[in-house]
UniProtKB/Swiss-Prot annotation:
It comes from the Bacteria. One of its GO terms (cellular component) is cytoplasm. GO terms for biological process: methylation. This is DNA adenine methyltransferase YhdJ. Residues 275-294 are annotated as: Disordered. InterPro entries: DNA_methylase_N4/N6, DNA_methylase_N6_adenine_CS, RM_Methyltransferase, SAM-dependent_MTases_sf. The gene is yhdJ. It comes from Escherichia coli (strain K12).
Length: 294
């Protein structure tokens, strides 16, 4: 959506950081070259991303987002998977569009705590939706054994499975369901970065371990705080991250340990409180009038 950034590439084949526009840079990636995509595009709700305000006409935003999704489908390998997050308001439109291109395998709910002020005239949002989808419903990567969690049986004693001969202790581990409980990243956490929509490392780790293998290429076209990249590299994957904001590019260079022209001081981590949301009136006064929803 935002243009005017001269693209710059950092890194190598194992970890690539691209400072540029997501859609423009996606179009440069070869077809069927990526194993896993995690996309967390703007929600168009007026977030302030280090001075860049997201507030566009709804029809323009949706058209742009659909074009991004189409490009993601093009670059994804036939056995690849894509995860996409967005707001509860936008996800129904995204869901319908993605059905035309992919097979949707899971509709995931990221359920989190919310200590902030909640809505007073409707039910406040306590989750964000995630779609997991694949190109080939019969042939895609899913490593269930890599993401097992403890099953909640409600019993205080070890259960015995008498269906087996001889009887054996009941297996308390299972593949997670589609409601994921991960706390949001807070200021006092070690993983905290100065980004208003930072996602937890644990959430990305589950996605990457489940839907890719060591050596696979993971793409994040809206890299943001580069959590996807940090987790991908730590998990033995290759990574391509696209980001338009220069301050967030610096985060990625530091977190992925990629060489650049920036000094150590410029890349140093300085913790600040999250950038606050703007009110509708405030954000509409700070963006291009041609993009404002009338």
């Amino acid at each position: 959506m935002r243009t005017g950034c001269e693209p710059t590439r950092f890194g190598n084949e194992a970890k690539t950081i691209i400072h540029g526009d997501a859609l423009a840079e996606l179009k440069k990636i070869p077809a069927e070259s990526v194993d896993l995509i995690f996309a967390d595009p703007p929600y168009n709700i007026g977030k302030n991303f280090d001075g860049l305000i997201e507030a566009w006409k709804e029809d323009l935003f949706i058209d742009w987002l659909f074009e991004v999704i189409a490009e993601c489908h093009r670059v994804l390998k036939k056995q690849g998977s894509m995860y996409i997050m967005n707001s509860t308001e936008n996800m129904p439109f995204i869901d319908l569009q993605c059905r035309k291109l992919f097979t949707i395998k899971s509709r995931i709910v990221w359920s989190y705590d919310s200590s902030g002020v909640q809505a007073k005239k409707h039910y406040g949002s306590m989750y964000e939706p995630i779609l997991m989808m694949v190109k080939d419903a019969k042939n895609y990567t899913f490593n269930g054994d890599a993401i097992l969690v403890e099953a909640k049986t409600g019993s205080q004693r070890a259960l015995i499975d008498y269906r087996k001969n001889p009887p054996q202790p009941y297996n308390h581990q299972k593949v997670p369901g589609n409601v994921w409980d991960f706390p949001r990243v807070r200021y006092l956490m070690d993983e905290y970065e100065n980004h208003p929509t930072q996602k937890p490392e644990a959430l990305l780790k589950r996605i990457i371990l489940a839907s890719s293998n060591p050596g696979d290429i993971v793409l994040d076209p809206f890299a943001g705080s580069f959590t996807t990249g940090a987790v991908a590299i730590a998990s033995g994957r290759k990574f391509i991250g696209i980001e338009i904001n220069s301050e967030y590019i610096k985060m990625g260079l530091r977190r992925l340990d990629v060489a650049s022209h920036y000094s150590a001081e410029e890349l140093a981590k300085v913790k600040k409180r999250k950038t606050g949301n703007l009110s509708k009136r405030s954000r509409l006064s700070e963006v291009d009038p041609d993009l404002i929803t009338k």
